[in-house]
Every structure is written in structure tokens, then in C-alpha cells.
């Protein structure tokens, strides 16, 4: 089932949230904005058949830059390359999806 892996920026703190939505990305941003005193905006995104797996892989990939939960202190280069990183991860998943040792449920 398709979903969107997103990178949302907290403009005041220059932190980025890596998350997933299966719905409308703009509605997700509005929901996150509620109760948040600083402006949030979409910095980058990737639509995928494997959004939850890619989100997990991204959290692992950027683990040294993790600040709190799903919020990360990413560089400009990380933000610019986000979609390419997601595409590489998606290709890895596709190569391994028939391997029974990789995962039981791919989505």
C-alpha cells in the first residue's frame, strides 16, 4: 500500500521530523502544526510502496543525528539528498523482498 515518507522542518529549531502518512501530506502537516508554536513546512518527501520500512531504515541511517524520537538534526545535504536516499533504500527492499530472512511483512 502506497504511502509518503516525509521530512518536515521545524523552522525555529532547524530540526527535521522523519515520518510516514498514507493520507494527504498537507493534512498531516496541518495536524502536526496544531499545538506547535513554530512553523512547520515540508522539506522533502518520497512516495513508496514500502513507506514504513523506508521510515525505519531512515531512522537507522540518521541515528547519529537523532535529537528526540522522530526529530533529527540534519544537514542541508541530508535534506537535499533525502529523496535519493529513499530511492536507494526502496531498491534494496525490492531486491530483498523475496528473501524469507529479510522480513515477514514488507509493508
Predicted segments with their positions:
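Non-catalytic accessory segments flanking enzymatic or RNA/DNA-binding domains
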Residues: 1-107
Amino acid at each position: 500500500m502506497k504511502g509518503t515518507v516525509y521530512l518536515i522542518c521545524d523552522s525555529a529549531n532547524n530540526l527535521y521530523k522523519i515520518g510516514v502518512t498514507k493520507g494527504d501530506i498537507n493534512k498531516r502537516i496541518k495536524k502536526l502544526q496544531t499545538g506547535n508554536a513554530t512553523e512547520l513546512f515540508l522539506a522533502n518527501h518520497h512516495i513508496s510502496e514500502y513507506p514504513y520500512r523506508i521510515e525505519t531504515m531512515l531512522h537507522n541511517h540518521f541515528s547519529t543525528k537523532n535529537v528526540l524520537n522522530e526529530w533529527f538534526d540534519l544537514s542541508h545535504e541530508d535534506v537535499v539528498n533525502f529523496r535519493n536516499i529513499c530511492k536507494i533504500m526502496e531498491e534494496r527492499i525490492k531486491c530483498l523482498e523475496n528473501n524469507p530472512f529479510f522480513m515477514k511483512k514488507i509493508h
